[in-house]
Amino acid sequence: MSNYDALYRQLAAMGQERWAEQLQATLPDKLALESTAKMAGWQSAMQSLPEISPSRIELLDTVTIGSSDDLGQVDREELMAHLQAFHPWRKGPYNFFGIEIDTEWRSDWKWERLLPHIQPLAGRRVIDVGCGNGYHGWRMRGAGAEFVLGIEPFLLSVQQFQVMQRYLCDPQHHVIPIGIEEVPPNLACFDSVFSMGVLYHRRSPLDHLFELKGCLRPGGELILETLIVEGDRETIFMPPGRYAKMRNVWFIPSIAAMTLWLERCGFTDIACVDTNRTSREEQRSTEWMRFESLADFLDPDDAQKTIEGHPAPLRAIFTATKP
């Protein structure tokens, strides 16, 4: 596991000494939650990564680390094999020393949709809830964010972040293996809070909104992306079983209902800034994610429905302010 000493110092400088102490006591134990065989494989792959310095780093328009000229052909083939040890790669894409890591999601498309609508990130402290492997965190740093903390309970995603961090060596971007429920309430120290693709997995969506609000300083901005359904303020869809083969989808609101939830939780300046029906081009199986993907989750005869007959995934991005 990464050495988080820089993170502890940064949190203490933000007035969060107690949280830094809690993390220092609990993060080392998180590794025990993953099987020894999996962790051993990841650690072996991590240790086998080449000791080279990237000739270029690009985070503004892409996430590009190094170039193909930094490696010989044999080293590149070995690097690709080591990267595949961290399969499946879900969030990206990354250009890694000339290797195109074509992830399941075109997360860059989502970033392009939301960036024009949010407060400028330059100089801001950001927490990204359910951040996956930290792809959007790198884009936030590229957009000028001063400090980015990603929280992600799945250790494989954290390990993928560490692969990139090994070469980017960015002391202002961290991903730690915790969930939002482990974040102390009412921190009130972040300028921007991102929660993308998380809300519908929460059994209590309003509690999740209050948790996000507690992370924000007064005047801070929430950026929330979630599944939605068409309807009015009283329309909330609760799947009777699976949704798009997912077991853990609980509540999918309409835009109007989501707006009402945000109002009831005390947010202001609420806006739905984007809606997008997920396409097979944006979410699909690739060489880097060889399991089922969106095409397998939809009705083969009607792409407007999931395999269970529910409305196909429609996503919306909301922005709101903590007064």
From Swiss-Prot:
Any one Gene Ontology molecular-function term assigned to this protein's record: methyltransferase activity
Chain sites annotated for binding carboxy-S-adenosyl-L-methionine: K91, W105, K110, G130, I180, E181, M196, Y200, R315
A GO BP annotation: tRNA wobble uridine modification
Reaction catalyzed: carboxy-S-adenosyl-L-methionine + 5-hydroxyuridine(34) in tRNA = 5-carboxymethoxyuridine(34) in tRNA + S-adenosyl-L-homocysteine + H(+)
Pfam families: Methyltransf_9
EC numbers: 2.5.1.-
Root EC class: transferase
Signal peptide boundaries: none
Assigned keywords, A-Z: Transferase, tRNA processing
Source domain of life: Bacteria
Subunit structure: Homotetramer.
Function description: Catalyzes carboxymethyl transfer from carboxy-S-adenosyl-L-methionine (Cx-SAM) to 5-hydroxyuridine (ho5U) to form 5-carboxymethoxyuridine (cmo5U) at position 34 in tRNAs.
Family that this chain belongs to: Belongs to the class I-like SAM-binding methyltransferase superfamily. CmoB family.
Protein's name according to its UniProt entry: tRNA U34 carboxymethyltransferase
Species whose genome carries this gene: Citrifermentans bemidjiense (strain ATCC BAA-1014 / DSM 16622 / JCM 12645 / Bem) (Geobacter bemidjiensis)
